[in-house]
Amino acid sequence: MAKRIFLFILTNLLVITTIGIVLTIITSVTGVGSYIQNGRIDLMALLVFSLVVGFVGSFISLGMSRWMAKTMMGVRVLNPKKQSLSYEEQQLVDRVHRLSRAAGMTKMPEVGIYHSPEVNAFATGPSKRRSLVAVSSGLLQQMDDAAVEGVLAHEVAHITNGDMVTMTLLQGIVNTFVVFLSRIAAWVASRFVKEDLAPVVHFIAMIVFQIIFSILGSLVVFAYSRHREFHADRGGADLAGKDKMIHALRTLKSYTGHVNEEDQTAVQTLKINGKKHSSLFSTHPDLDERIRRLEAK
């Protein structure tokens, strides 16, 4: 569980930490924009600093999302204009594009396959016009056509719902609180040591508290991730039909054990299939609950 949490928050944490350290060094050297003056903390200056670091960090992560997913998951993008595709690959591209057009998209998402025995798929990208839908080789091997259709419709719904942008805004708010609170906590900690040790203690405490608050903040992100899955299920049902969407979820349930727990879970929130049992740290709600809600639709 600790590894899953760590991998999920790693990219975002590294970005905001790097930006925060760079800005802290700049303000320390130049004195411009410093939120600590004469040993006292300027809360308004710190809030502005936190907003800049928090939202810049989250939008950098958003901009990198498609490239990062391709790199970390080893996604092979299928482009009929530049390469010869097999019948199965061409059929996958055609299905994604057909569902995308049905959803009102004018710019078709990239379509890719990543090699993994897990039965899974994900969608990502900074915008509807720069999106990616990728499926695992295990999904194509194990699922029938109706189930694949339901999964792809679910992923297209994520794109048209703008889930990545909404997630970025939420992450920006979480980041702001993480940066703000971690620096206040670090400042308080530095007050309990000798003056010559205060800068070192402040820096170390800032990093430690930032990690702790990031883990706590991830609970909010995970909760939203679970919430958005229900919306994507409904959107998938509208595109592919309720029966296909329910069939896809039931098929996923039978292959839940094939989810790769050692995979690069920094993209775990993007996937359709999560762990079998839901918890506070789950990115996906329980599959039985997802099926129940669709059946009641």
Swiss-Prot record:
EC number in record: 3.4.24.-
Co-factor requirement: Zn(2+)
Where are the catalytic residues?
E155
Any one cellular-component term (Gene Ontology) = plasma membrane
Compartment annotation: Cell membrane
Check the record and name the InterPro entries matching this protein: HtpX_protease, Pept_M48_protease_HtpX, Peptidase_M48
List membrane-spanning regions. 5-25, 43-63, 169-189, 203-223
Claim: Zinc is one of the keywords in the record: yes
**Topology relative to the membrane, per the entry?**
Multi-pass membrane protein
- MF terms per GO, please? metalloendopeptidase activity; zinc ion binding
Does the keyword Protease feature in the UniProt annotation? yes
Question: What is written in the cofactor note of this entry?
Answer: Binds 1 zinc ion per subunit.
Going by the UniProt record, its keywords in alphabetical order are: Cell membrane, Hydrolase, Membrane, Metal-binding, Metalloprotease, Protease, Transmembrane, Transmembrane helix, Zinc
| Swiss-Prot/TrEMBL GO biological process terms | proteolysis
Which amino acid positions bind Zn(2+), per UniProt?
H154, H158, E229
Family assignment?
Belongs to the peptidase M48B family.
Recorded protein name is Protease HtpX homolog
Q: Which organism is it from?
A: Bacillus velezensis (strain DSM 23117 / BGSC 10A6 / LMG 26770 / FZB42) (Bacillus amyloliquefaciens subsp. plantarum)
Please state the gene responsible for encoding this protein: htpX
